[in-house]
């Protein structure tokens, strides 16, 4: 039976390793801590030393860049089953490049990156898991860059709805606008236009079946 003390990391790592068990899991269990975060609470700030990796048990988070003038740009969101870390902070002496805030009341699991590296050095399944998670992170980053550089604002909104239909319902519009590189007013106009086009297509499809 799979350990359930820290289900988020267990599921994440075993799936990444392609196995139902991981050697020396007890070492990871001892290093993982569970944290409850209230809506609006901060997981970590931008510009601090924080060499930890997180897995989301429950809830929703936003990962944001904060400019000197207070302007916030949201790089991504993390919901149940997702993981996150500031890669720059995982290097010796490194600091976080962004901050993380809870959109909903949530539960997180946290582990020191050094523990993961030590396990990967000793055990091939752990090395495979970390490699696969690195690929997942890189693929997300690549997709995000492609959308920002090649899609129109409406295209980015439609792509987000297609990729994250349920998540879109949980994210405040102001946060979604900051993620898509829009103003809330601009996003509202796009959302209304998209809804009208969907309604129009649905009506046309219905009429076609009636004739």
Residue map of PLM features:
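Conserved small/polar residues in nucleotide/adenosyl-binding loops
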Residues: 204-211
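Polybasic "coupling" helices that flank or enter modular domains
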Residues: 101-184, 189, 193-194
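Hydrophobic residues at beta-strand termini and immediately following loops
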Residues: 35-37, 78, 111
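Generic structural signal for secondary-structure transition and capping sites
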Residues: 33, 37, 83, 165-166, ...
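Short Lys/Arg-enriched helix C-cap and helix-to-coil transition segments
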Residues: 199-203
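Cyclic nucleotide-binding regulatory module and flanking cytosolic helices
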Residues: 1-36, 89
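Cyclic nucleotide-binding regulatory domains
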Residues: 41-103
């Amino acid at each position: 039976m799979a350990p359930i003390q820290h289900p988020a990391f267990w599921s994440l790592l075993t799936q990444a390793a392609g196995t139902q068990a991981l050697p020396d899991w007890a070492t990871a269990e001892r290093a993982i801590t569970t944290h409850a975060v209230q809506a609006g609470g901060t997981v970590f700030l931008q510009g601090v030393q924080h060499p930890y990796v997180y897995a989301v048990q429950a809830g929703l988070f936003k990962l944001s860049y904060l400019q000197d003038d207070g302007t916030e740009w949201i790089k991504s969101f993390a919901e149940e089953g997702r993981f996150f870390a500031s890669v720059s902070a995982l290097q010796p002496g490194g600091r976080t490049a962004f901050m993380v805030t809870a959109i909903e009341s949530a539960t997180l699991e946290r582990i020191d990156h050094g523990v993961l590296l030590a396990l990967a050095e000793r055990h091939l399944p752990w090395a495979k898991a970390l490699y696969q998670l690195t690929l997942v992170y890189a693929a997300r980053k690549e997709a995000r860059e492609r959308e920002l550089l090649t899609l129109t604002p409406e295209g980015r909104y439609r792509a987000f709805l297609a990729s994250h239909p349920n998540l879109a319902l949980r994210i405040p519009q102001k946060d979604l606008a900051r993620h898509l590189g829009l103003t809330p007013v601009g996003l509202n106009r796009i959302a209304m236009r998209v809804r009208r086009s969907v309604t129009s297509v649905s009506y046309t499809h219905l009429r076609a079946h009636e004739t």
